[in-house]
Every structure is written in structure tokens, then in C-alpha cells.
Design a protein with these regions (language model features):
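Transmembrane helix-loop-helix hairpins in multi-pass inner-membrane proteins
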Residues: 1-44, 101-216, 301, 305-368
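Helix-boundary and loop/linker segments of multi-pass membrane transporters
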Residues: 47-55, 84-87, 235-243, 278-279
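Membrane-embedded helical hairpins/re-entrant loop segments and their flanking transmembrane helices
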Residues: 72-97, 269-288
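Hydrophobic/aromatic residues in alpha-helical transmembrane segments
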Residues: 73-78, 115, 261-268, 291, ...
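Alpha-helical transmembrane segments of multi-pass membrane proteins
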Residues: 89-100, 128, 282-294, 323-331
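Juxtamembrane inter-helical linkers in multi-pass membrane proteins
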Residues: 94-100, 206-232
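Alpha-helical transmembrane segments and their immediate interhelical loop/hinge regions
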Residues: 223-273
Length: 368
């Protein structure tokens, strides 16, 4: 799972950074132009619906604070997972770079291998680094696979899923509702496998997965798959003996990060909502956003570029003034996604200068 330095630096090529920007803005721009032509409204009237008021400024400022809350949650999570051996500033650098690599990779790929590499360069053993990354993946999976149904305790499930019934995806050849259940089912299967491999029967899962990967049909993925299987077993040794207080703290930090992430979108909606949003509206927006994040897992584009913006317009069109849903989607991504593409380069330059040449043979914490 550990990346090489050369592979890491390749991620910072101009092409890798520009690709998600071009894809996202290109798809949205084309769709936005089509909707504008279809509506027949003068461009001036459409732009007037984005009138900035004191209310808009307040909510957008709050959205920026929610992004800070999100990053703080992940920094706190990383501090807990490393037994507070990493400084806050180091945690911030790792989180920002982790987000950068997630932004330039398809959602299903993410930046796990790069995250392990960065932690190893911070003098954390490969075993502990692997355990940390698998723990974050596990907690994220638990959070956003369960949230749509937790939200349905407060908001009718029919209201949460209503827009998906009428959206057809040419990529899937069917409704987005089917796409959601396919993505959710795959994530649940993956989550169950993680629980079994990390906590319930790590040696049994290791044995079966190793033999499965020996089949001829998996020969192209065998080498990488065997590394992953061994990484899971290593991580399980580190995690199974953790006390309840550890899991409570790391879950609170994870929840804080995801709540901050979700409330960014709520703030963007509230900034330009035709009428003030009620508590029910905010809960409904959270429920639909949980659906959106799962649908985004299907995206083959870097950082779900294009898919995230279109999904926003499909799911939240009834929250926004007519004709401006895609514009709000772009604003949402300008706050929550594109900054990481910009921040990544200077942060990486600083990080490489600080850690390059570190002796990883003397780990600061962790297991071998």
C-alpha cells in the first residue's frame, strides 16, 4: 500500500491538477448553458437570482467555518490515531495532502496508499500507518452508509429519495435510484468485509482472500491484492486491543469532520434559498447529501468532478431559485473541493523539504 516518492510527485503534474477542474467545469458549463437556453430567461434575470445580501454573506462565511471544522475533525482524528505523537501542524499538512490526492483520484481509489507513505515518512511504522488508514476508511464507511437511514428517523424516507426516482443516468442506463442502491450495497459489503478482517476473524479472512487471489481470473490484481490482504492482517493486530475510550474519541472526531462537511452544503443552500430554511429543511438536506455522497462513489472522474455538481442540481433543485441550482453546485465545490487542488502544491513543497531523507527505519510509534 505504500507509495514511492516518484509516484507521489507525479500526482502534482499540471495535467493531474487541471483534469478534474476541466471535467467538472466543462460538464457543468455545458449543462448550465443547455438549461439556460431551455428556460428562455435573459441572462441578467438569472444572475439577479444570485443577489448577494447580508444573509448570503453570513451563510457563506459560516460555510467556510464549517470547512475549518471539517479539517479540525480530521486533524483531531489523526492525533488520536497516532497516540498524539504528531503535532497539530503536521496533522494539518497530512490532511491537506490526503485531500489533494483524493481530489485528483476517482472516488473509489482515494489517497490511501499516499496517506500510508506520508505517515511512514513522519517516522510512523508501516504497521501503524496501515492501521491508521484502514481505521479512517472503516469509520468513514460506517458514517455515510448509515446516515441516510439515520436521517430517515427525522425526515420521511420518501422525501429523501424522491428526486432519484425521476433521474435517469445514461452511464448506468437506468434511474439514479438503482445507482444509489448498487453503490450502497457495494459499500455495505466492503464494510462487512472490513469488520470481519479487522475485528472478527482476521486470520480466517486472510486465508480465504489469499486463496481467492490465487485463482487465474485474479492474476492481474494478485500482487496488489496480496499486499492489501497482508496489510489488513497487520492492521487488525494494532486495532483489536484498543480500549473503548479510544474508539469513542475517534468516533467523535470522525463525526465532527463529517458534520462539518455536510453543513457546508446546507450553508450554501441557506445563503440563496428563496425563503429561510426550517429545521426540517436542513435535516432533509443532510439526508439527501448522504445519498449524494454514496452516488458519487460510482463516479470514474477525479474527485467526482462533474458528477458531484450534477448530483447537487438533481437532488437540491427544489431548494434553490429556479435556474440557479447548478450555479450553487459550483459555489459549493469552490468552497469544499477546488481549494484542495490549489493548496496541495505549496503544502507538498513544504512537506517534501521537511521530511525528505527521514530515516523510516527508526519509527516514532507503532508496530512493525
Amino acid at each position: 500500500m505504500v507509495a514511492k516518492t516518484s509516484e507521489l510527485l507525479k500526482q502534482f503534474s499540471p495535467g493531474r491538477i487541471l483534469l478534474p477542474v476541466v471535467l467538472g467545469l466543462g460538464i457543468v458549463g455545458y449543462t448550465l448553458y443547455g438549461e439556460w437556453v431551455k428556460s428562455g430567461l435573459p441572462m441578467g434575470e438569472v444572475l439577479d437570482r444570485f443577489a448577494w445580501t447580508s444573509r448570503s454573506v453570513f451563510w457563506i462565511a459560516l460555510a467556510l467555518l464549517m470547512m475549518m471544522l471539517r479539517d479540525f475533525g480530521y486533524m483531531w482524528q489523526l492525533r488520536i490515531l497516532t497516540d498524539r505523537k504528531l503535532e497539530w501542524r503536521t496533522c494539518l499538512e497530512i490532511i491537506l495532502l490526503w485531500d489533494f490526492f483524493a481530489a485528483v483520484s476517482p472516488s473509489m481509489v482515494g489517497g490511501a496508499a499516499v496517506a500510508v507513505f506520508m505517515l511512514v515518512k513522519e517516522q510512523i511504522s508501516i504497521g501503524r500507518s496501515t492501521a491508521i488508514v484502514f481505521t479512517t476508511v472503516f469509520l468513514d464507511q460506517v458514517f455515510y452508509t448509515s446516515l441516510p437511514f439515520f436521517a430517515s428517523l427525522f425526515v420521511p424516507q420518501a422525501d429523501i429519495f424522491a428526486p432519484l426516482h425521476y433521474i435517469r443516468s445514461e452511464l448506468l442506463g437506468t434511474s439514479m435510484m438503482v445507482g444509489f442502491w448498487v453503490a450502497w450495497g457495494g459499500l455495505v459489503v466492503y464494510l462487512i468485509l472490513l469488520i470481519a478482517a479487522l475485528f472478527v476473524a482476521p486470520h480466517w479472512i486472510n486465508w480465504w482472500l489469499t486463496r481467492l487471489l490465487m485463482l487465474r481470473m485474479f492474476r492481474f490484481w494478485r500482487s496488489r491484492g496480496l499486499h492489501m490482504v497482508n496489510d489488513l492482517l497487520t492492521a487488525s493486530r494494532d486495532l483489536r486491543d484498543r480500549k473503548s475510550i479510544f474508539w469513542f474519541q475517534v468516533w467523535v472526531a470522525t463525526s465532527l469532520a463529517w458534520i462539518g462537511r455536510y453543513l457546508v452544503l446546507n450553508c450554501v443552500l441557506a445563503a440563496f434559498s428563496p425563503v429561510p430554511m426550517t429545521l426540517f429543511d436542513h435535516l432533509l438536506a443532510i439526508g439527501r447529501q448522504a445519498v449524494l455522497w454514496i452516488v458519487m462513489v460510482l463516479s470514474p472522474t477525479p474527485g467526482s468532478a462533474g458528477v458531484a455538481e450534477l448530483g447537487f442540481s438533481w437532488l437540491f433543485g427544489d431548494f434553490a431559485p429556479a435556474g440557479v441550482a447548478l450555479g450553487l453546485a459550483i459555489l459549493w465545490r469552490l468552497i469544499s473541493y477546488y481549494p484542495y487542488l490549489i493548496i496541495g502544491v505549496p503544502v507538498m513543497t513544504r512537506w517534501v523539504k521537511r521530511v525528505y531523507g527521514s530515516d523510516v527505519r527508526q519509527p516514532r510509534i507503532g508496530i512493525d
